[in-house]
Amino acid sequence: MKTLGFSPKQKFCARRQTQRWLPEGDRSSSFTPSTMETQRKKFTKVSVNSELLPVDLIMEILKKLSLKPLIRFLCVSKLWASIIRDPYFMKLFLNESLKRPKSLVFVFRAQSLGSIFSSVHLKSTREISSSSSSSSASSITYHVTCYTQQRMTISPSVHGLICYGPPSSLVIYNPCTRRSITLPKIKAGRRAINQYIGYDPLDGNYKVVCITRGMPMLRNRRGLAEEIQVLTLGTRDSSWRMIHDIIPPHSPVSEELCINGVLYYRAFIGTKLNESAIMSFDVRSEKFDLIKVPCNFRSFSKLAKYEGKLAVIFYEKKTSGIIGLWILEDASNGEWSKKTFALPNLAASSTNSRILKLQKFRTTDADTCEIIFTPSYAHSSLSSAIYCDLKENKVRKFVKEGWTENYLPCNADSVSSTQVENLMFL
């Protein structure tokens, strides 16, 4: 049985809340951490509508709810609030949330407004053909103010959390709760910074990685990684820790993907920093490794997830709608396998049509192994996303309702297909 990690204050509140349901002989005048489990086994029941429910059963019920009622249930009692805010329960809720259908998140950066627009789309499961009508999807749009656009970068959603901002004020944002936290400032001076966010499924920890690049010495404006700092979210000492391990010389690129506790990001290596490579960061052990890529690896490809593995997707022949996939089979030995797929007719015609020529593949659906094509700009005529099942040669799409009627002077900085409800309180 899992012992809840309550603080002393929470334990006192829990005792007062639960003591009403304890048998008279079981009530104790003292409450210490060592007796927490014993006391919990003795009562493990709270009164809900005159019914007695074990605490473990309450947790099993609560974790299956959506986030909105859980937020309301914080006001039910101090005991319920302690349960919902407990890290162990938050991990249970996240694991349950990962089993549900994922949402699609667009993050747009509007330079004129100095803001970030994030829209959450509920995917349509209706398969369509090129002659059938599209189905619509509901969405929620958030407007997040960002006071500066200087060197601002945006990391894709990782289990519901988004990291964005300039080096001076990096922000972790939870679209579900609409809460954010500003991380401690990184002193980088005029040097550029790449930030990434990863998740360790074993410990349930989120970690933010910041890599400070040196001043570029070459015409390609790429600088070597000089300093690497890591911050663990949700800890009492939320400060940056310097990584002193020797890492392979590389210049990081702001494109990353976290799969099963390993954060992958693109990089350039070589004396001229013009050779493509992929770096891996084990979120739990905080170890870096260099992954060799195929000799004909294309620099304009996209990191993706395919059948639970890291993959690199690219156009083999764009005019004919041929998609190529490099799939990482063995990271330690740099072994890759290659697959090619012909896009279904609807997707192939969409990528070449005039009205949808701004669409490009942005991500893959980890649950269905589908490639997702999304618009690069926010406009009512470009408000659809196309899902291509390469294995089954099928296509489905949805149309987002309520998109802006005018062009926004912005690009889609990131598109994530794995958005889930996250109970983490920032």
From Swiss-Prot:
SUPFAM superfamilies (alphabetical): F-box domain (SSF81383)
Recorded superkingdom: Eukaryota
Entries under Gene3D superfamilies matching the protein: 1.20.1280.50
Pfam families, per the entry: F-box, FBA_3
Entries under SMART domains matching the protein: FBOX (SM00256)
Ranges where the F-box domain occurs: 47-92
Xref: NCBIfam families: F_box_assoc_1 (TIGR01640)
Protein name as catalogued: Putative F-box protein At4g38870
Organism (species): Arabidopsis thaliana
